[in-house]
Regions:
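Conserved C-terminal RecA-like helicase domain
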Residues: 1, 102-210, 225, 233-241, ...
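SF2 helicase catalytic motif II
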Residues: 1-32
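A short beta-strand element within the Helicase C-terminal
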Residues: 2, 210-233, 260-263
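Structural recognition of the conserved hydrophobic beta-strand(s) that form the central parallel beta-sheet
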Residues: 3, 34-41, 210-213
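Conserved segment of the helicase C-terminal RecA-like domain
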Residues: 33, 238-281
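Conserved interdomain linker/interface between the two RecA-like ATPase lobes of SF2 helicase motors
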Residues: 37-144
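C-terminal accessory/interaction regions of large nucleic acid-associated machines
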Residues: 235, 303-546
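Long, hydrophobic alpha-helical segments
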Residues: 267-326
Length: 546
């Protein structure tokens, strides 16, 4: 049985939709006897999932159903931020009337006073700029510090994981953790997965009072709230809106009438009514089969390889790419790179890696792309390679975040000046350049720093470093570069039997060369889990764990 949850992702107008359908088709090819289940909320034509991937022709017994169920009802409000008044309005003007009626209370304040929780849906940029903390200060001030030992333990776990300090405002200070101590949660797609799981558990345990969240929460696990406030309304994303509304209210076993509250801006009222009534349908044509996508040519090659069966599941690359990565232009660079990456004692230390190493990695990536890198792509790529080298040396996520923060915010120099009694000079030091995460390849990418040049070192947001580091590790290194460089070095090892190439290939892909740890990683265990589980493992391979 293979379950594809949130299967509406196949319709996303981004490479995510492309990758989703490619996984479906590869699974159909290799697991033809398996039962495939697709689950998507609010979709009127679930049969489109069968049509776009040819499942109806493969299996004529395939069935589908559309369940129109609602777990709990909602009351709708609009909030006039100028007058600070709330108004009731009907989701269906034909049935409930077109007029809004003033509410004589604040539903957010009321929920918080009763010990309830509030989800506020905002743009990620407003979280990064801290605008949300000013905009919703009235409600934040109602949230007092939490003294529950279970909650404090979870906060301390998160603090240790990201490597933050909460005692020194000048170094490694996490504003996110300070807010969390008062039950204020921040949840978005650049939050490390481990951190997200802690925060979701924190919320489920009832410790969350206010949650500022982006669209990542749409497909999150069960995290209901008493009030959902849509500070951001995206009319084009009807499924997103309906998913978020669905988080308002929870059904309980208590003898009370269960319902949730949904709040919008006045200018979103009519658009919301339209979205609320709109039927959601999937396209019956896969993005793999469209020909007018405006995407990088590498993705066009990927689409063609999936459709023609010219895709290697061993390396997660097209056969065309694999041939390219065995060319003389690649194999002449690899031994030079291995010489620089290894010393007699093993891997060279990260701080002794020569700039030629970055140039050689760039050269290999250039051969893969079949073109020169733009200046902006080079900055992003070099940052990714530096982080990858740190990982190869066993640096934890927290240590990598601390290293990047120390560099960009001039920690060493600021501390020296501060200890010398020159606090004003320490406070006036500005940041050093560091490239922020961006998806590459992207020929249109512009060069920009993670922090503007005039930013003071003492004002560098440690949380922003955490989010950016995770984006590099998850979206670029883990999702793209690891497969590419694993293929380069593993193929070189097979051709020339250079053990260093095999070691480097394993470290690039898995972060270890230990075969037991590699198998455990492939089974889905994290390094944190492997640390205590490994002694319990007698044997492990592709068939079983003993």
């Amino acid at each position: 049985l293979i379950l594809f949850d949130e299967a509406q992702l196949s319709d996303e107008q981004s490479v995510r939709g492309l990758y989703f359908d490619s996984i479906v088709r590869r699974a159909l090819k290799y697991f033809s006897d398996a039962k495939f289940v697709f689950a998507h909320p609010f979709i009127e034509n679930p049969e489109a999932q069968l049509q776009k991937n040819g499942i109806e022709t493969i299996d004529t017994t395939a069935t589908y159903s559309n369940y129109e169920l609602k777990n709990v009802g909602q009351i709708f409000y609009t909030h006039d931020s100028t007058s600070q008044k709330f108004y009731h309005f009907g989701s269906d003007s034909a049935t409930l009337g077109k007029r809004k009626l003033e509410a004589n209370f604040d539903p957010i304040e009321s929920a918080l006073k009763k010990g309830g929780s509030v989800l506020i849906y905002v743009p990620k940029s407003h979280i990064y700029s801290k605008q949300v903390y000013i905009q919703f200060q009235k409600y934040i001030s109602m949230c007092q510090p939490i003294d529950n030992p279970i909650a404090i333990k979870m906060i301390d776990e998160l603090k240790e994981y990201i490597g933050a300090s909460t005692t020194d405002k000048s170094f490694y200070n996490s504003d996110m953790l300070e807010k969390l101590r008062c039950g204020i949660v921040v949840h978005h797609g650049s939050m490390p997965l481990t951190a997200r799981l802690i925060l979701e558990h924190f919320t489920q345990q009832g410790f969350c009072k206010i949650c500022f969240a982006t669209s990542t929460l749409e497909q999150g696990i069960n995290m209901p709230f008493d009030v959902v406030y849509l500070d951001r309304f995206e009319e084009s994303k009807t499924l997103s809106v309906k998913n978020l509304i669905g988080r308002a209210g929870r059904s309980t076993n208590k003898p009370v009438f269960d319902f949730g509250s949904v709040i919008l801006r006045p200018n979103a009222m009519s658009r919301f009514r339209k979205v609320y009534r709109e039927k959601n349908t999937l396209s019956s044509k896969s993005r793999l089969d469209t020909t007018d996508d405006k995407i990088d040519e590498k993705y066009e090659e990927y689409k063609e390889a999936i459709k023609t069966g010219e895709f290697s599941d061993e390396y997660n690359l097209t056969n065309k790419d694999l041939e390219k990565l065995k060319s003389d232009n690649v194999t002449t660079v690899v031994p030079t790179l291995l010489d620089m990456m290894f010393s007699d004692a093993g891997f060279v230390l990260p701080n002794t890696v020569a700039k030629e190493v970055y140039e050689d990695f760039q050269c290999l990536y250039k051969q893969y792309l079949g073109r020169e890198l733009t200046a902006a792509e080079k900055f992003v790529f070099d940052s990714a390679i530096k982080i990858r080298i740190w990982k190869m040396h066993g640096k934890t996520f927290s240590k990598i975040c601390q290293e990047r923060y120390a560099y960009v915010s001039n920690v060493a120099q600021r501390r020296l000046l501060s200890q010398a009694g020159q606090q004003d000079r320490a406070d006036s030091l500005t940041v050093r350049y560091i490239a922020g995460y961006n998806d590459i390849p992207d020929k249109e990418l512009r060069t920009y720093p993670l922090f503007p040049a005039e930013t003071k070192g003492k004002d560098v947001d440690y949380d922003r470093i955490v989010y950016d580091t995770y984006d590099f590790l998850d979206k670029l290194i883990g999702f793209k570069l690891s497969d590419l460089f694993y293929a380069i070095f593993h193929q070189y090892y097979l051709a020339y039997q250079d053990d260093r190439a095999e070691r480097l290939a394993k470290y690039i892909k898995y972060g270890t060369e230990d075969s037991t740890e590699i198998w455990m990683l492939r089974y889905g265990f994290s390094f944190e889990e492997i640390e205590w589980l490994k002694p319990c493992v007698e044997s492990i391979d592709q068939t079983e764990i003993k």
